Amino acid sequence: MADSNGTITVEELKKLLEQWNLVIGFLFLTWICLLQFAYANRNRFLYIIKLIFLWLLWPVTLACFVLAAVYRINWITGGIAIAMACLVGLMWLSYFIASFRLFARTRSMWSFNPETNILLNVPLHGTILTRPLLESELVIGAVILRGHLRIAGHHLGRCDIKDLPKEITVATSRTLSYYKLGASQRVAGDSGFAAYSRYRIGNYKLNTDHSSSSDNIALLVQ
């Protein structure tokens, strides 16, 4: 039985844990798998699940602090809950502002990725392929293995080394960086590698008009 003040006893807590141990174990195992294997360039299915979890954490966290402020234990905890609710709300708002700015720059739904606001854009076969990056590097590597292209670890489809784009870009909510194709080397027929080096950065907007040249993939934002 619960105490008169609404708390539970140690024995009741032990029984509760015994009943829910299996479920808690599965939840922790799921979280471990998401943290260890859910990367955009490894397992796209697990990565999407992780993004959904991250999206849901924002409103759930905000709701927890709001409820803690409404049903406060005392004024001190209520004040802390209000401050944390304001902080989470501002962080959530800044995420949406950065995401919409990035979407205006790239027109890609990857702009709303809660894990990163850096997007790789590769023009290939008349289509601009966009993938998330965790950080913007000075040099980005491209590898072709048996005719399959990987850039920054992302599989982008079939491509011959002579058909590699001359330029790729990396977009953030504030800038668009140009990367120029540098050294490239064919290895064993349909395999090879290349490197793209950053040579320009500015307030540009990705040109999504696929009818234009694939080498002209960005426009200056006025």
Curated annotation (Swiss-Prot):
GO terms for biological process: symbiont-mediated suppression of host cytoplasmic pattern recognition receptor signaling pathway via inhibition of MAVS activity. Glycans are attached at residue 5. Residues 2-16, 71-75 are virion surface. Residues 37-44, 106-222 are intravirion. Disulfide bonds: none annotated. GO terms for molecular function: identical protein binding; protein sequestering activity; structural constituent of virion. It comes from the Viruses. Keywords: Glycoprotein, Host Golgi apparatus, Host membrane, Host-virus interaction, Membrane, Transmembrane, Transmembrane helix, Viral envelope protein, Viral immunoevasion, Viral matrix protein, Virion. The chain crosses the membrane at residues 17-36, 45-70, 76-105. InterPro entries: M_CoV, M_SARS-like-CoV. Changing residue 82 to T: In strain: Eta/B.1.525 and Delta/B.1.617.2. It holds the Pfam family CoV_M. It is found in: Virion membrane; Host Golgi apparatus membrane; Host membrane. HAMAP family: BETA_CORONA_M (MF_04202). Belongs to the betacoronaviruses M protein family. Component of the viral envelope that plays a central role in virus morphogenesis and assembly via its interactions with other viral proteins. Regulates the localization of S protein at cis-Golgi, the place of virus budding. May act by binding cytoplasmic c-terminus of S. Homomultimer. Interacts with envelope E protein in the budding compartment of the host cell, which is located between endoplasmic reticulum and the Golgi complex. Forms a complex with S proteins. Interacts with nucleocapsid N protein. This interaction probably participates in RNA packaging into the virus. Interacts with the accessory proteins 3a and 7a. This is Membrane protein. The lineage of its organism: Viruses, Riboviria, Orthornavirae, Pisuviricota, Pisoniviricetes.
